[in-house]
Amino acid sequence: MAQQLDKSSDATALIGAMVTRSRAAQSVLGKSDFASRCAALQAAADEIRTQSAAILEVNAKDVAAAKASGISGAFIDRLTLNDERVEAMATGLEAMIRLTDPIGHELARWQQPNGLDIARVSTPLGVIGIIYESRPNVTIDAAGLCI
């Protein structure tokens, strides 16, 4: 039980540190221009390709551990990366580059009876947390959409 509490407090500390770093990054990213965000997405896609062998090696260890613990075949299929899935992660980021900039668009405008003008403008999300179970490619999709 004590070991379980240690793991829990370690996880809590790790998540707290990640949130702190994420908030600091958000304050910079939230002010970045579209070209900079596109460059970051391209750099991430390039790094995925550069590191694909290492990504597949670590994923193979995750898959082996999942199989050893008796996880279902469907779960293991979702967990498993191969060359095609890793390339799809990179091309997915590149597809996001071709989208229009979602930030700064006026979504609605109206005037209150007292004459106050109100505009709804798209803004960066800020820091988000994602909990998922078995699809490592979701990490890249979610991160790309957040950039």
Regions found by a protein language model. Name each.
Residues 109-147:
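Substrate-binding/gating loop at the entrance of the active-site cleft, primarily
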